[in-house]
Amino acid sequence: MFTGIIEKMGTVVEKSPNRITIETEWKDLKVGESISVNGVCLTVAQSENFRPLGRFTADLSPETLSSTTLDSLKVGNRLNLERALKLGERLGGHFLSGHVDDVGKVRAIVREERGKIFEITTSPEILKYIVPKGSIGVDGISLTVVRVINGIGFSVSIIPHTEKVTTFGFLKVNDSVNIEVDMLAKYVENLINKKKEKSGITREFLLEKGFL
């Protein structure tokens, strides 16, 4: 489990069809540890301590390669990194599992006085989980949705600090990003669907009774 608060940025130093090696400031990573890499939960398969930096290697499954942006990474690319949440630590963002729901694309970048607005397109299937002022994970970063662009995607506001300490500082129009919707939205939908099956409650019934 992760929080979407990026701890470090890493750099791709080796890439094969099913493995990736990342250079990072962390030199105490343990084999078997979970790391969020651009929002994708990977398991440390090998850890090496170099000076002044460390490296870790993770395996990339066919599912990961087909459903995330990691397949397109190249040596030299920068990455958002976060270690798994420990009990007792502060939750500064929102819960993220590291399981990507969709790959979106940067549609537009609009400069504002105090930062930038990024418009991101996504598949219509996940838009039902995205609401204004709700939480969303983009490349592993916990962000707040500014608005939903009906049928197309959503926008987020990026302050200068976030741009400086994450890969948002490198993103350009048409770049792809990993998207994870708020897991609570999916749990609520699942709960409602189960209740509908048991109770016979439908959208039409709720409209008739004034609940919607």
Over which residues does each language-model region extend?
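Conserved loop->alpha-helix
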Residues: 1-212
